[in-house]
Amino acid sequence: MKRVLLVITALLSLTVLLAACKKSGDTISTPTAESTPATVEATPAPTELPPYEANVLTGEPKGADYPEGQRITAVMVNNIVAARPQRGLSKADILFEIKVEGGITRFMPVFTDYKTVGEVGPVRSGRDQFFRLILPWQALYIHEGQSVVMQQYAIDYDYGKLNNNDGANGYRDYGRVNWAGKSYNAGSLALEHTMYTNSDNIANYISSQNVDMNRTYNSTFFNFVDYRLGTTRDLSNSLDSAYSDKYGPVVSDGQYIEIEHSQSYKTRFIYDESANEYKMQQNYSDGQWRDTVDEAADNKVLTFPNVIVLYTDIHTYPGHEAKDLQYVEYAWGGIGYYCYGGKCEKIYWQKGTPLEALRLYYLNEDGTCSDTPLEVNIGKSYVAVTDVDFAENFVHSTLDGVNLSTATTQTYEKSYVEDDAKAGETLGSSTDDLTAAATGSGEAETNEAPAQEKTPADEGAPAENTEAPADETPADETPAE
C-alpha cells in the first residue's frame, strides 16, 4: 500500500513540474501513434579556409608570379628637393620616409620582388635608422655609400653582401632633368642626384657576387587583416573608437594628413574616396606643394591605402655633430597614427632591439599600449618615422577649409651642402665618411675629412645629446622570420 502511495505522489509531482515549466499559451500534449517526430537540422560544418598565403609586405594574396622563398629588397633613394622627381617609388610595397642630416628626409622603398622594380633612384647612401627596420627581415639593402654608423651595423650583424654599397652596379644619368629644369650636364645639378639602378643591374649584382637571396618568411611585415575573410577593417568601428584619452579622440577625421619631419620638410596626403587611397604630396623650395610622382612610370602620382606615422626621439649622434648624423630611438616605442579610409586612429608602436621587428598595437583606454596587435588593412603602406618634437604639428582633418594650392612653409636645402662629389668619382663611392674603396663590409674608413654639411638656416643647430645609444645587440638573438 505504501509503494502505491509513493508512485501516485511521484506522478503528481511530475505533473506540477511540467505545468510550472510550461510557457504562457503553450499546451502539453502526448504524441499519438500518428504524430511525426520533429525534424532536427544538422549544424553545417564551418567552411574550411584555404592556407594563408599572403604577400609579406602587403598582406594581399600571393599571385602566380609571387617570388616564393626570395628575400625582399630595399633601396635608399634621395629626397632632397633638388633630386625630385624620383624613379621607381610607385613600385614600392612599403615606402619609408625618415629624417637624416640637415633636416632633409630620405626614402627607403621596399619591394617584394627586385625583378619588377624597373629603374629606381636617385640612389643615395645608407643610414642605420632605415637599416634597423629591415634587419629582422634580412632584406637585400642597396645604397651608394654609407655613414660610419651604418658601416658599423653592417659589420656587427655580419650583413656581408646583403649590404650593397655601390647602388647594385649603379650608373649615372648625367642628363636627367629635375623638377626645376636643372641637370648635371648643364652644370646646375649636383652629381649626388644622378645615380640610378634597375632590376637588371640588381640581378647582375646578385649573380656575380653569389648573393644568397633565399629566404622564407613565416609572417607578414604588419599584422594584416586576413584577406581570406574578404573584409576590411573600418576605423570608424575600431575597438578604440568609443573613448577618448587625454589627447583627444582615438579615432578621428583623416581625409587630410600633414606630417612635419622638420621645419623645412613636410609630406601630406589627400584622401580620394572613389579610389580609397591617399595621394602623396611634398612641399618645395618655392613654397608650393607638388604631387610626389614616379617619372619612370609616366609621372604616376604615388598613392597608398595605408598611411602610418610613428613618433619617437630623433637627435644627433654624439660625436657626429659635424655631419649631423641622426640617431632614431627604436628601443622604447611610442605613440603613432594609422590612417585608412579617411580616418586616423591613434596607436602604439614598439620595436626594441635591431633584430626585433616593428610592431603596432591598439591603445588601452588610459592611453597605454595594449597587448592586442593592430590590424592593418591589406595593400601598400607609407610609413613615416618622425621626430616627437613635431608631434603637436601633426594634422589630420576633413578637407573642409584646407588650402590645397600652396605650402605653409618652404624648404631650405639651398643652405645645406650634402656632398662635394666630383665628376670622376668612382661609382658607388661617397663622401659620407667613407672612401671609394669601402664595400660595406667595413674594410675602409676615410682618411680625409668629410665635406662639411650645414643644417638649414631657419632650423638652428641640431640638439646635442650626450647619451650614447643603448647597446641593442643581444648575443643570442636570431633574426625574425
Label each PLM-derived region with a short phrase.
Residues 1-4:
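Positively charged n-region of N-terminal signal peptides that target proteins for export
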Residues 6-10:
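Internal alpha-helical transmembrane segments of multi-pass membrane proteins, especially GPCRs
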Residues 11-15:
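Alpha-helical transmembrane segments
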Residues 17-20:
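C-terminal motif of bacterial Sec signal peptides marking the signal peptidase cleavage site
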Residues 22-24:
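Bacterial signal peptide processing site
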Residues 27:
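Active-site phosphate/pyrophosphate-binding segments
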Residues 30-49, 426, 435-441, 446-461, ...:
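Ser/Thr-rich, Proline-interspersed low-complexity disordered segments
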Residues 34, 40, 44-96, 101-430:
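A surface/extracellular/periplasmic glyco- and lipid-processing/surface-interacting theme
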